[in-house]
Swiss-Prot record:
Pathway assignment: Cofactor biosynthesis; 7,8-dihydroneopterin triphosphate biosynthesis; 7,8-dihydroneopterin triphosphate from GTP: step 1/1
GO molecular function, one term: zinc ion binding
Name of the protein this chain belongs to: GTP cyclohydrolase 1
Pfam families: GTP_cyclohydroI
Organism: Nostoc punctiforme (strain ATCC 29133 / PCC 73102)
Length: 235
């Protein structure tokens, strides 16, 4: 499910509509190229000079002087920033989880909500940022709570579209835990809609991905949506 809204919408809160939740069909970790998995490799150190040269060309392209004092170190700074913002390519799900899976016999919903995230839109390489809500219903096994936030972080630190990002997080949790169900909702503001193009400050996009009982059972979805709408009393 994907929901987009902007100022002037009739919704007073995120319009999460359980009946429209989508099922997930597993697919490759990254986007595909003509049906084949795209050739994407972890960045190499020698590429940093190529990135710096590219930034210099961009500076020239916008009519600036890359040799003036304020811009002398900009290519290096931008290259390093891009490496950080896409550091998720250097991580793998197996290394991230690091065997932090435990047999607890727990079979009720586990939810980590309001996980702040930042990512880069792959179309314009502009930021989008927001909050993720991640839940699963264990099949006896649980994972360390921080790992759910780290999974969100790993996939966010790549060139992304929000729809795929949401799906990848759900599929990752399904892969490591084989739970009875997984639910992920992400709410984000996209700078490519705010700073350029349609230029709509205040617009936001909601995406959801449902697996297993969250997709199959209305009551389970409704419980999840109610929990992420609920405002904790201790904050």
């Amino acid at each position: 499910m994907t929901i987009a809204s902007s100022n002037g919408s009739n919704y007073s809160q995120s319009p999460l509509i359980p009946d429209l939740a989508d099922a997930i069909t597993p697919r490759p970790d990254r986007n595909t190229n003509n049906g084949r998995q795209a050739d994407v490799f972890p960045p190499k150190e020698e590429h940093i000079e190529e990135m710096k040269d590219a930034v210099r060309k961009i500076i020239l392209g916008v009519g600036e002087d890359p040799e003036r004092e304020g811009l002398l170190k900009t290519p290096k700074r931008v290259a390093e920033a891009m490496r950080f913002l896409t550091s998720g390519y250097n991580q793998s799900l197996e290394e991230l989880v690091n065997d932090a899976i435990f047999d607890e016999g727990h079979n009720e919903m586990v939810l980590v909500r309001d996980i702040n995230f930042f990512s880069l839109c792959e179309h314009h390489m502009l930021p989008f940022m927001g909050r993720a809500h991640v839940a699963y219903i264990p099949n006896q096994k649980v994972v360390g709570l921080s790992k759910l936030a780290r999974i969100v972080e790993m996939y966010s630190r790549r060139l992304q579209v929000q729809e795929r990002l949401t799906r990848q997080i759900a599929e990752a949790i399904q892969t490591i835990l084989e739970p009875r169900g997984v639910a992920v909702v992400m709410e984000a503001s996209h700078m490519c809609m705010v700073m350029r193009g349609v230029q709509k400050p205040g617009s936001w996009t909601v995406t959801s991905a449902m697996v297993g009982v969250f997709q199959e059972e209305h009551k389970t979805r409704e419980e999840f949506f109610n929990l992420i709408r609920h405002q904790p009393a201790f904050f």
